[in-house]
Amino acid sequence: MPSPRLRFGVLGAADIALRRTVPALLAHPDVTVVAVSSRDTARAARFAAAFGCEAVPGHQALLDRDDIDALYVPLPVMVHTPWVEAALLRGRHVLVEKPLTATRSGAEDLIALARSRGLVLMENFTSLHHAQHGTVTDLLRDGTIGELRSLSAAFTIPPKPEGDIRYQPDVGGGALLDIGIYPLRAALHFLGPDLHAAGAVLRRERRRNVVVSGHVLLTTPHGVVAELAFGMEHAYRSEYTLFGTAGRLRLDRAFTPPETHRPRVEIHRQDALDIVDLPPDAQFANLVRDFVLAVREGPGRLTQHHADAVRQADLVERVMAVARVRWC
């Protein structure tokens, strides 16, 4: 007998939910989207009409429903904790936008609550679910560029409209939490968990008191270095390069590739360039698949996922602790 479909509620009619995540949820044969909530009833109604679900006025009303198994929470990071906690206390599985929280203690507390109740809590960090990074990892493991010496990663985007949530530091958290988290996570993925924050410069806009860009320097205990750049006042850039003793690997469109994108891994060696062409991959669909599997098979599948989320939050705090702020 097939398992019943997983009934999702969407806590917030965010743009990422509309464009990417909810279509991926609905494309999974074992998922249905029941309702969406928003403080803006007209926005919720438009969202619901687009996906054939019910519009609910206010997030608490969605939490109080009895026909929801899981909640997708695309709210701004600085309000994640109260709503994720409330959802877990109501017995709901939770898929929450990255980052889970802005602090290590906050991440640990939510993960502990989910585990104590046997519930799935997953961070919606979709780029981690794209197959291109596995290919790069395999090339590194095979010694394609010799011993790894450094990583350079950048994720930058053009300025957003004036009212964008990213410019509200007490809600959206600014560029470090929304954009800088991508190169930070790449450093954790390729260089391992024992990263030291050697320094950082954060460019903070005086008018809105929000971080709009930054550079971070990380090191491992063995001296491998990561140089990271991020921001929302630049031309678009989404890439990383791994430098080794015998060459370098470069990947463009590393963090937010569309489903139609055909990745190309560049392998640069002395006087030679090789290209590894990869097929398109649907990272949002992959994440939804993994979430459903965790619900069906048990949250024990997420032990490494949770450890990585805690390390990520810890690294963010350590970067902020050493950062020098430059006002603009």
UniProtKB/Swiss-Prot annotation:
GO terms for molecular function: nucleotide binding; oxidoreductase activity. Its EC number is 1.1.1.384. The keyword NADP applies. Pathway: Antibiotic biosynthesis. Signal peptide: none annotated. Transmembrane segments: none annotated. It catalyses: dTDP-4-dehydro-2,6-dideoxy-alpha-D-glucose + NADP(+) = dTDP-3,4-didehydro-2,6-dideoxy-alpha-D-glucose + NADPH + H(+). It holds the Pfam family GFO_IDH_MocA. It is an enzyme of class 1 (oxidoreductase). It comes from the Bacteria. Keywords: Antibiotic biosynthesis, NADP, Oxidoreductase. The keyword NADP applies. Substrate binds at R20, Y236, T256. GO terms for biological process: antibiotic biosynthetic process. NADP(+) binds at S38, R39, L75, H80, R166, D178. This is dTDP-3,4-didehydro-2,6-dideoxy-alpha-D-glucose 3-reductase. It comes from Streptomyces antibioticus. The gene is oleW.
